[in-house]
């Protein structure tokens, strides 16, 4: 612990009494903006993302963001299940376990979003989002690609939801952008969402050189492009969030969970 009088004085002058917003808040700072065209002052909430440390989280991992898949196409003995669940390399544990499942001739088929609240939030945004996210997670395993813009391209080629692509409509890109924007400004996985944006101003991004860039929600296209081209999937702790292990259900079917977490470069 150390004192920084000049910083404390500045924080007090801008009425900042906490270094970090609560995890349940999307807004880190509220700013009154003056629109020169309309002459109207509006108070806007902004989320602050810093590139000075590690990559910022856009959608936090939790048990609520687990997606459940059924293992189909092969039988597994209890010993084989235990053997696969014990695979624990220093890196790529999830990939190695999935590869072991595939070597038995089995495949992962999307079953459900584990958390009903998160499922409802996704369906409110777009009824196809649970299926799209499940395909993003599978395609990440298949290709090793984690950048969401590139994964969206892969889904557009594969078209797993069989959209009509005769007119080049960017279904996957648009829906993923909508998800990212909602997660950035208001929606949280484990909290029933009203559809309202909390951080209705946009993002303040602190660059590595200390400059601050504002991605204002008024310029929605630019804001959505920033999220889309900087977002990537990251694998969280398998033990903390209880995923990436084969589970034998009461009915004898086998399940395998994958976790959905998004960060920004």
Where are the regions that the model predicts?
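Short, positively charged
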Residues: 1-26, 32-265
């Amino acid at each position: 612990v150390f004192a920084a009088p000049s910083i404390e004085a500045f924080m007090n002058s801008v009425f900042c009494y906490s270094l970090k917003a609560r995890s349940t808040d999307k807004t880190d700072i509220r700013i009154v903006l003056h629109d020169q065209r309309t002459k109207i002052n509006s108070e806007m909430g902004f989320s602050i993302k810093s590139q000075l440390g590690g990559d910022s989280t856009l959608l936090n991992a939790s048990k609520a963001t687990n997606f459940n898949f059924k293992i189909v196409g092969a039988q597994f003995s209890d010993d084989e299940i235990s053997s696969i669940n014990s695979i624990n390399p220093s890196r790529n544990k999830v990939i190695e376990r999935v590869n072991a499942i595939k070597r038995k001739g089995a495949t992962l088929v999307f079953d459900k979003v584990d958390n009903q609240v998160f499922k409802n939030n996704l369906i409110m945004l777009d009824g196809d989002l649970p299926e799209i996210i499940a395909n993003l997670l599978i395609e990440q395993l298949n290709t090793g690609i984690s950048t969401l813009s590139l994964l969206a391209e892969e889904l557009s080629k594969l078209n797993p939801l069989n959209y009509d692509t005769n007119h080049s409509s960017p279904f996957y890109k648009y829906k993923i952008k909508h998800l990212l924007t909602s997660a950035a400004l208001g929606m949280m996985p484990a909290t029933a969402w009203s559809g309202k944006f909390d951080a209705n101003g946009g993002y303040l991004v602190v660059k590595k050189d200390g400059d601050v860039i504002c991605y204002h929600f008024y310029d929605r296209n630019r804001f959505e492009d920033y999220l889309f081209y900087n977002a990537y999937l990251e694998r969280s702790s398998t033990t903390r969030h209880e995923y990436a292990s084969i589970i034998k259900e009461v009915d004898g079917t086998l399940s395998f969970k994958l976790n959905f977490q998004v960060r920004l470069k």
